[in-house]
Amino acid sequence: MKPTKLGFLLGLSLLCSLSPPVLSGVERLANYLCKDYNDPCLLDVEPGSCYEVHFRFFYNQTAKQCQIFLFTGCNGNLNNFKLKIDCDVTCHETYKNPPLPSGDKRKRSLRALATKNLATDWRLTTLQPGRLRQTERKETLLQRARRESRRQPLARHHT
């Protein structure tokens, strides 16, 4: 390779390596100025311009729900979800801004959740590696005790 070509390629690679910080600043500014347009839920449905057939979901702002549409495979926008649950979680108000429970309900639900989690998986109660075996042993003993308490003791007669 000639020194001139090598110098040109070296200069080009140097220019490309220095460009990303400038472009990322421009990208951040664009994101700040256009944040409403980056929300896929605010975009209209875009079926695309190819000839494939894909069933997808989009968020309909008027109906306030996710609806099915035919996507042709290319040139769509971000308001295009493969699964309805993805569309719901991203766009539906229930998932975007979940209602906060009142004080009493919240205390009860947290207590019930904690009790349920502790009852179903004893191994989660101890996270220290050295004590994990002890926790598993306690679980085994507890399960054995429950099994034995369910059985009716058989009367044994020794003669």
From Swiss-Prot:
Under Pfam families, the record lists: Kunitz_BPTI
Instruction: Give the subcellular location.
Output: Secreted
Tell me the PROSITE patterns matching this sequence. BPTI_KUNITZ_1 (PS00280), BPTI_KUNITZ_2 (PS50279)
What are its GO cellular component terms? extracellular region
Alphabetized, the UniProt keywords read: Disulfide bond, Protease inhibitor, Secreted, Serine protease inhibitor, Signal
Q: What InterPro entries does the record tag this protein with?
A: Kunitz_BPTI, Kunitz_BPTI_sf, Prtase_inh_Kunz-CS, SPINT4
Q: List the disulfide bonds.
A: C41-C91, C50-C74, C66-C87
| Keyword Disulfide bond annotated | yes
The gene name on file is: Spint4
Protein's UniProt name: Kunitz-type protease inhibitor 4
One MF term in the entry's GO annotations: serine-type endopeptidase inhibitor activity
